Curated annotation (Swiss-Prot):
GO terms for biological process: cell surface receptor protein tyrosine kinase signaling pathway; modulation of chemical synaptic transmission; negative regulation of neuron apoptotic process; nerve development; nerve growth factor signaling pathway; neuron projection morphogenesis. This is Venom nerve growth factor 1. InterPro entries: Cystine-knot_cytokine (IPR029034), Nerve_growth_factor-like (IPR020408), Nerve_growth_factor-rel (IPR002072), Nerve_growth_factor_bsu (IPR020425), Nerve_growth_factor_CS (IPR019846), Venom_nerve_growth_factor (IPR020433). It comes from Hoplocephalus stephensii. Pfam families: NGF. Residues 47-66 have a biased composition (Basic and acidic residues). GO terms for cellular component: axon; dendrite; extracellular space; synaptic vesicle.
Length: 243
């Protein structure tokens, strides 16, 4: 009997010793911990990939300034708009480079090259000699190339947006306007030069005319008649005290 009890006790102890240990007591670096670390790394990597893909699908919103600049630069003009000659005006120029002196090669304020200016003035004097050196203009005018016109009044009296840059065939052109205005409303103390100040009041004023220009209509480019300065004239008013 004692032998049987002794045998059962030994078998019980051997069974306890041979039983597998709990995962809670597994030391660091054991296979169970390695599998858990690999699983965590895999989940983290998948999370990073998912986050990266989400960022690519939903990019960060751009600034308002960038959006406005991009929308203005992405407006493409149909080349067919320039095929009809009736839309062309001698005072409107589309060019990738600064415009020339002027239509008749007279002095304008746009130029920075003094030598080129002097050459063109001399050429004009040779082509159109002045026989009477006493000739003077009634009003003094100045002609300029306007390079940054953004607003103008159309033929209906509405304020419209003028296109400064025109994207044509993947090349950016600038829209230039050749404008003429009065340098001074009173070139002489009495008003216009050469008038009889005893009987007339006079002054110089800038007049406008309509030219076709590319303007914005929603997200499309369209031709419109707009007003620009084109001349300087003398206005005379009869003095009433002579009647």
């Amino acid at each position: 009997m004692s032998m049987l009890c002794y045998t059962l006790i030994i078998a019980f102890l051997i069974g306890i010793w041979a039983a597998p240990k709990s995962e809670d007591n597994v030391p660091l670096g054991s296979p169970a911990t390695s599998d858990l670390s690999d699983t965590s790394c895999a989940q983290t990597h998948e999370g990073l990939k998912t986050s990266r893909n989400t960022d690519q699908r939903h990019p960060a919103p751009k600034k308002a300034e960038d959006q406005e600049l991009g929308s203005a630069a992405n407006i493409i003009v149909n080349p067919k708009l320039f095929q009809k000659r009736r839309f062309q005006s001698p005072r409107v120029l589309f060019s990738t480079q600064p415009p020339p002196l002027s239509r008749d090669e007279q002095s304008v304020e746009f130029l920075d090259n003094e030598d080129a200016l002097n050459r063109n003035i001399r050429a004009k004097r040779e082509n159109h000699p002045v026989h009477n050196r006493g000739e003077h203009s009634v009003c003094d005018s100045i002609s300029v190339w306007v390079t940054n016109k953004t607003k103008a009044t159309d033929i209906k009296g509405n304020m419209v947006t003028v296109m400064v840059d025109v994207n044509l065939n993947n090349e950016v052109y600038k829209q230039y306007f050749f404008e003429t205005k009065c340098r001074n409303p009173n070139p002489v103390p009495s008003g216009c030069r050469g008038t009889d100040s005893r009987h007339w009041n006079s002054y110089c004023t800038t007049t406008q005319t309509f030219v076709r220009a590319l303007t914005m209509e929603g997200n499309r480019a369209s031709w419109r008649f707009i007003r620009i300065d084109t001349a300087c004239v003398c206005v005379i008013i009869r003095k009433t005290d002579n009647f």
